[in-house]
Amino acid sequence: MSQREGSLEDHQTDSSFSFLPHLEAKIRQTHNLARLLTKYADQLLEEYVQQQGEPFGLPGFSPPRLPLAGLSGPAPSHAGLPVSERLRQDAAALSALPALLDAVRRRQAELNPRAPRLLRSLEDAARQVRALGAAVETVLAALGAAARGPVPEPVATSALFTSNSAAGVFSAKVLGLHVCGLYGEWVSRTEGDLGQLVPGGVA
């Protein structure tokens, strides 16, 4: 671990540690954005399910978890990592989400053209998560723990999102559900990780 990273981790155990005022303000601002997007993500997931028809939303329905190239949910070990590494992983996931959300929106425009609210929500989610990712990267850079290079955008989902067969449509709906779920998981995780840097925040 570098000396800079060590200083960042010391914040978790040393209550006297404080950031420069402008950095503290940026952390609070980014944390507030993550908290707001966590709320929006719950609404997006609910709205998405409502628009997919049966069996989505039925009690006991458990859709298969289809793989997504370049993105998965936070690993169980995530919480045990140093906060700087957690934020790096958050930033990487957030950078991958806009392209996936855009792909879901395009497919939903074909499947549910009369659901403008859902389409707008997906468009807003892609824009907002892009802004959150940029803000997290700014915080990391200011802390001397910048993200380790760009993450390639996932491209292997295109065939599943565009197939018009019955199986392809169902898979596209399931993938969209998965993307909306991952969006919620990562913005919530980002909120929690940033909360450890906010003065008075809880671990």
From Swiss-Prot:
GO molecular function annotation: cytokine activity; leukemia inhibitory factor receptor binding
Disulfide feature: none
SUPFAM superfamilies the UniProt entry points to: 4-helical cytokines (SSF47266)
UniProt xrefs under InterPro entries: 4_helix_cytokine-like_core (IPR009079), Leukemia_IF/oncostatin (IPR001581), PRF/CT (IPR010681)
Biological-process GO terms, alphabetical: cell surface receptor signaling pathway via JAK-STAT; immune response; leukemia inhibitory factor signaling pathway; nervous system development; neuron development
One Pfam family from the record: LIF_OSM
Keywords of the record: Cytokine, Secreted
Gene3D superfamilies: 1.20.1250.10
GO cellular component, one term: extracellular space
Tissue expression summary: Expressed in the ventricle and atrium of adult rats. Also detected in the lung, kidney, liver, skeletal muscle, stomach and urinary bladder. Not detected in brain, colon, testis, spleen or thymus. Overexpressed in the ventricles in the case of hypertension and hypertrophy.
Coarse class of the protein's main subcellular location: secreted
Localization of this protein: Secreted
UniProt similarity note: Belongs to the IL-6 superfamily.
Function field: Induces cardiac myocyte hypertrophy in vitro. Binds to and activates the ILST/gp130 receptor.
Protein name: Cardiotrophin-1
Organism this protein belongs to: Rattus norvegicus
Gene: Ctf1
